[in-house]
Amino acid sequence: MSSNKLTRRRFLSTAAIGTAAIGTGFSFPRPAIAQPIQVSYTLSWLPTGQYAYVYAARQLGYFKKRGIDLDISRGFGSMAANQAVSIGKFQMGSAQAGANLLGIMRGLDLRLLGTHGYDATLGIVALKKGPIKTPKDLEGRTIGVSAAGGDTVFLPAYCKLAGIDFDKLKVVQIDSKILEQSAMSGVVDSVVVTGLSSIPNFISEDVPITMLPFSTVGLQFYWLNTITSGDFLEKNKEVADQVQAGINEGMKFMLLNPQEALERHLKEHEELALGKNGKLYVELGMELTRAIMMASESVEHGLGYTDLAKIDAQAKVVKQYAAKPTDRDPPAAETFCSNSQAEQVTLTSAEWDQVKSSTKKYRELLGSL
């Protein structure tokens, strides 16, 4: 795996691409610090069950013991998250790999420090009782999208690869808070989604769906990466690495202790449990996420590991099908990805068997999409 090795000098010296502006420069003192360093961190979406591992890591002191006070904020889509991190509005965050790669091609100063899951589960959801059964059925129908979502940017590419006339779609921008509800209530015929975020909304409300996965036409990407700006990383590499280390430990906790992780998340986010199906909604998001955390990368190399060859391949897909003519060619993954915290948090074979067994029905759900 020598081609996947990244030197500190090369990683830190990679210049910001294009015209992205860097906001406030952050730099923390290097000596031992009595008080934890506060780091602002944005999620890519609402703090649903899929992010239980991040909150569990904070609750269990995985950041604190490393001298970090992680201030977590909700997100408004992956494109919004990586833009905010690149300009310094947040020091770190997480966003979908496909959106991150597109952002880098468009000039965002981003560095990817780890991978949280290995299938972004992008696709289109329609009600099973409705008229959409195949990709071609989308023509002439309304489709809701979240403007800043990491999934939305790949809709034209999906249409092209699936043989759909994109001009025959009626695309409607919808607030992310009511995206799924707009489909359930019939405001739109379908919605572009990240399955991990949206499927729980439908299942918990006992609404049968048809899912048209982007992966069936070759648009398959990693889920979330930990992101930061090159400017922040150059000045605070140890801090950024410690955040990633805490996240890796949080992932292990959620994989091995799903029930406690669920209870902890519901306790911190009581509003998510409101309503008769609130707990089920959170549980579904968490369990689907546990399912995509298990892959050859994490099993063989440890939690958080990023296969740079796969990132390069995904970048080529983004460039070919989602980039604009003005977007630059993707740089080599080794210039903006790091595995400095990989191979430090691992599971035994027996533990992975436990994860595989406990996520079987959720992997089947994702596989049936």
Describe each PLM feature range.
Residues 236-325:
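Secondary-structure end/capping motifs
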